[in-house]
């Protein structure tokens, strides 16, 4: 402090990564116009709310260093400006979360980061199953993208390796895969398979259920057709109560409670017009409800006796997320006729899978 510096003087050397405390080697060059009588180290960073004050005391050194403005990282746009741009070009039907809108600029593993550097533990965005920007996923994507981008009309080992590893995690009867681009496409295909296999059209669903945003899936999603802007339940959709052992009419996490809720499914399929009973193995949008024991098993038995099939929607709950099992339906020791997976199986990238029996396929 207080020493004069001439153009061309050496002011610093950059050491190796290890000498820099594990940080990327860099030069922290800061102009201070007023030390404010501070004896200790002058602040080198500041919270976003204090940025303008500290910038007035430590103006940008780019002119002194001869750095062109084009090399300076621009200040992030104001959230309100981004919101106005979004409102001009993106449908208002697509909502933005939270009263104080978040400008998220990147994600790393379990964290999201906003434009001001705040980190958020991501407990909402459920599609990056093994974390945002997971290095192993990025590496695998890069490897495949530089090798081949194609579809299923040609032979290629990768899709075969993937399907074989996937069905190895499932019950033996579930052995045929269909690959699509999303959970919505997967559920739509599952419905088509069920209707083709049974020759019937109707569907039994749980109250509060959500299975996708295509026209056919809105029609089997009470969360959508009973929600804001919904058109109500189609005649071919039959809604049964959520198997909620805490708030519902039957209490307790017992097999008796599960059997009691399954009787609603039995009544719904009794008329013989149903092609399928579709349910999330652990309903997500409906409230993160863990069904009581024996519910899915008993419901599947009733469904099959009526000539229909059981579709397990594992988009939100499958692939290890139950904790003690790999698939949600395994919690009740039941084998579905069709299993549906969505974007989480691609860590948020456009991928969905339908796995079913050879007879249905």
Label the model's feature ranges.
Residues 3-6, 16-19, 23-73:
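Acidic, glycine-rich catalytic/binding loops that coordinate metals and/or anionic ligands
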Residues 4, 9-10, 119, 344:
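Residue-level marker of beta-strand positions
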Residues 9-15, 359:
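Conserved "cap/hinge" positions at secondary-structure junctions
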Residues 14-19, 223-225:
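Short beta-turn/strand-loop junction motif enriched in small, turn-promoting residues
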Residues 73-361:
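Conserved N-terminal phosphate-binding loop of PLP-dependent enzymes in the Aspartate aminotransferase
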Residues 10, 23-27, 273-275:
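A short pocket-lining beta-strand/turn micro-motif at the edge of beta-sheets
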